[in-house]
Amino acid sequence: MEKWFRYLLAATAILNLSGAIAFAPPIHSSAESSGLPPAHPFYLWTISSWILIFGVGYFWLALTAKPERLFIAAAAAAKLAIAVLLFAFWIVGDLPLIALFVGCGDLFFAIAFMYWLFRTR
């Protein structure tokens, strides 16, 4: 695996860790004042745990340098879906501008993952 892609995976792991922390109920309750909608703790813990699980996967791939194409393809699809959802909810006014910026980060990683997938066929 190329060094740039390992760094990209490590950066994605860090982004996911911060996302998992942001959605954890103790933190998220203070984030509601920033325009994020209120949610039941069950949903917040579910989202937080999935973000963390993907982050651990990114970290593991970066650490071992053993690419798992299926995981990277699923990650690209998930990142793209999140970026589209954040953009859609921002454009109709349901999410604050920060959601658009977060979506741009996810879109960047999705494109980078797809680039790597097509390049290493």
Language model feature labels by segment:
Residues 28-39:
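Membrane-interface helix termini and inter-helical loops of multi-pass transporters
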Residues 21-24, 59, 87, 111-114:
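Membrane-embedded alpha-helical segments of multi-pass transporters/permeases
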Residues 14-22, 39-63, 74-80:
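Core segments of alpha-helical transmembrane spans in multipass integral membrane proteins
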Residues 53, 81, 103-108:
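Membrane-embedded alpha-helical segments of multi-pass membrane proteins
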Residues 1-15:
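Cytosolic juxtamembrane helix and N-cap/initiation of the first transmembrane helix
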